[in-house]
Amino acid sequence: MEGRRFDSVLSYGKLEYWRGLSKSMGSFSSPIGNISGSGDSTINDRDKTIENWSDRSSYSCPNVDYLFGVMDILGLVSDDTFFVRDGSGDTYSIYFDVESQIFEIDNDSSFLSELESSFSSYQNSRFGPKDDNRDYYCYMYDTKYSWNTHINSCIDSYLRSEISIDSYISSSSDYYNDSYIYTFIFSESVNDSESGSSGIKTITNDHDSNIREKSNDNDFDINKKYRHLWVQCENCYGLNYKKFFQSKMNICEQCGYHLKMSSSDRIELSIDPGTWDPMDEDMVSIDPIEFHSEEEPYKDRLDSYQRKTGLTEAVQTGVGQLNGIPVAIGVMDFQFMGGSMGSVVGEKITRLIEYATNRSLPVIMVCASGGARMQEGSLSLMQMAKISSVSYDYQSNQKLFYVSILTSPTTGGVTASFGMLGDIIIAEPNAYIAFAGKRVIEQTLNKTVPEGSQAAEYLFHKGLFDLIVPRNPLKSVLSEFFQLHGFFPLNSNSKH
């Protein structure tokens, strides 16, 4: 634990804030959160640099942002003791620990009361009643309850507002990508074992220069420690708060990009609660060709992915209800060996289609795969023909309904077989769909593959599939398709 000095002045009913750091860490002359000003004063000049909030109309950030700004995020997530001076000249020691949810002031409630009073008066003047303004919780602490109990949720709300809502971040993607919070959470040491340190790029007050500084081992530990709180978008590199990410269907709040979903999340999204009945869960691969690998044996790799994902194979199959309509569904999981199709994956899908044929159920296949599994050689390639054969009987002979959903990525043997055999083929927005990957084509043919030529939007205009459907309305779209083809809910109380 380290001590840091904070000088705060409470005057005219408003909280003002200034941070002084040791010379080794640099100093900030303007209130933290102001990213448009500049200056280079030291602690001794604090009386000159502290201003009233009423004089800061030119600043772009909300007033409350001066208490904790993006540049001070390291202080928020550290286990530190702060020293604070109020307007009366009294000093207090504050212990702040996010992980343990502790916010303590040393045996004196006067400063805490004054601080709460300042926030309370400010929130009423700026936001009005909390019930009338949805931004209330983004910036303000809840003074009705214990600070110690709610400090964690307050920090959650603050970080979410800084990352997702503040206009000065969302309005400039260049500055956003280089912002302190972005690099703090996602920077990794390339040669950590050799150097023991990593570089962190910070954005300075003038928005024009980047300061390169070395983080110590403690900073790197914090980086890994809090990275689990965020999900980075593959498209815009924006940060999405993980606590709300699943409820958003893994769709980026910044740009609307559809990120990868696990098979379990997709089942939860598509199947009515309490109706899922999995099939062939105990079926596992056994290394049929004794694949030789100098790095990691095939069996060990399977065990590793089984522990990591909680799955036995790269596909989950079963039956359930979709808005009350009984369906057979198979969902591939890219997190398990890239969703590769081996003999077990092929067998589980084959059995699913045979079961649906006997029960006259519609079939949904959600594809997310890198293709055939190389560790099983020609046995994995045989699965293409086996699934296609049983699918032919299901569709052509039994006249039943098969819907294929292509997600990112869908490539290789899956694309060349059951992925493209659906009566209706649906793709997710921005999905990567191909037989051979871009790098393979370029290295094989020595030709450049145009950017975006394997994206769902481009392929849709070439007639490769029927429609592109976002995740939000997907369940209702499938329900309409099934009813159009004569599959109806089991009872009248089911959702249409």
Curated annotation (Swiss-Prot):
Every CoA carboxyltransferase N-terminal domain range? 229-496
What molecular function does GO assign, one term? carboxyl- or carbamoyltransferase activity
Point out which parts of the chain are C4-type zinc fingers, as ranges: 233-255
GO cellular component terms, semicolon-separated = acetyl-CoA carboxylase complex; chloroplast stroma
The UniProt keywords, alphabetically, are: ATP-binding, Chloroplast, Fatty acid biosynthesis, Fatty acid metabolism, Lipid biosynthesis, Lipid metabolism, Metal-binding, Nucleotide-binding, Plastid, Transferase, Zinc, Zinc-finger
Q: In which pathway does it act?
A: Lipid metabolism; malonyl-CoA biosynthesis; malonyl-CoA from acetyl-CoA: step 1/1
Q: Where does this one sit in the cell?
A: Plastid, Chloroplast stroma
**Its EC number(s):** 2.1.3.15
Q: Does the keyword Transferase apply?
A: yes
UniProt-listed PROSITE patterns? COA_CT_NTER
The free-text cofactor remark is: Binds 1 zinc ion per subunit.
Annotated catalysed reactions: N(6)-carboxybiotinyl-L-lysyl-[protein] + acetyl-CoA = N(6)-biotinyl-L-lysyl-[protein] + malonyl-CoA
Task: Tell me the residue numbers annotated for binding Zn(2+).
Answer: C233, C236, C252, C255
Q: Which cofactor does it need?
A: Zn(2+)
Enumerate the PANTHER family for this protein. Answer: ACETYL-COENZYME A CARBOXYLASE CARBOXYL TRANSFERASE SUBUNIT BETA, CHLOROPLASTIC
Give the protein's function: Component of the acetyl coenzyme A carboxylase (ACC) complex. Biotin carboxylase (BC) catalyzes the carboxylation of biotin on its carrier protein (BCCP) and then the CO(2) group is transferred by the transcarboxylase to acetyl-CoA to form malonyl-CoA.
Family note: Belongs to the AccD/PCCB family.
The entry describes its oligomerization and partners as: Acetyl-CoA carboxylase is a heterohexamer composed of biotin carboxyl carrier protein, biotin carboxylase and 2 subunits each of ACCase subunit alpha and ACCase plastid-coded subunit beta (accD).
Under what name is this protein listed? Acetyl-coenzyme A carboxylase carboxyl transferase subunit beta, chloroplastic
Q: What is the lineage of its organism?
A: Eukaryota, Viridiplantae, Streptophyta, Embryophyta, Tracheophyta
